[in-house]
Amino acid sequence: MDSAALSGFAPAACAGFLPAQDAVPCSHAVEFYQDRDAFLDGLSDFIRSAIQSGGACLIIATESNRQAIALRLRTSGVDLPHAVQNSQYLLLDAEATLDRFMVDGWPDSQRFFATIEPFLMHAKASLGADVKFPVAFGEMVAILCADGHFDAAIRLEQLWNELARKHSFALRCAYPSDGFADGTRGKDYLARITAEHSHVLTA
């Protein structure tokens, strides 16, 4: 999916994953990607920037993507054991986290807040003196869409936005673009998901 396919959908667009120091509190950005490796490269750069600037990251991702991110961070010189020990690099499994707040195929708002808020607060408490807010990446919405639960994914995006009205953090999420290839239906869900974000990130 190229940037032209997103025209008219996005409140704003920017190239790639913004460096963490350029993110703004309560921003909620989304990337629709075709190339997984390129996506992971950009996401890993975003996380590395946050860690090296004294920030803290909450990463909610699948096991395969957590491993791929860790490899990229180590290769780029990030001391992951140190980051983990200092709570700058907080990891949650996306599927296990979903299981904690999904009820009958739908995100339960109270369970969502009870699940995510403590980790956000922990990340905030781990920030360096000159860092104002943590950053987060969430892959749970992509899992819901991959399983055909598009409406539940949209509701989860809305819950993240509700959380952002209570806490300052910068959120990134991402979807494989081939999940929206189903003609008019796919285009409709693409527009609705995009509308829940402040930025669309393009390669």
Which functions belong to the PLM regions below?
Residues 1-203:
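Non-catalytic regulatory/interaction regions at protein termini and inter-domain linkers
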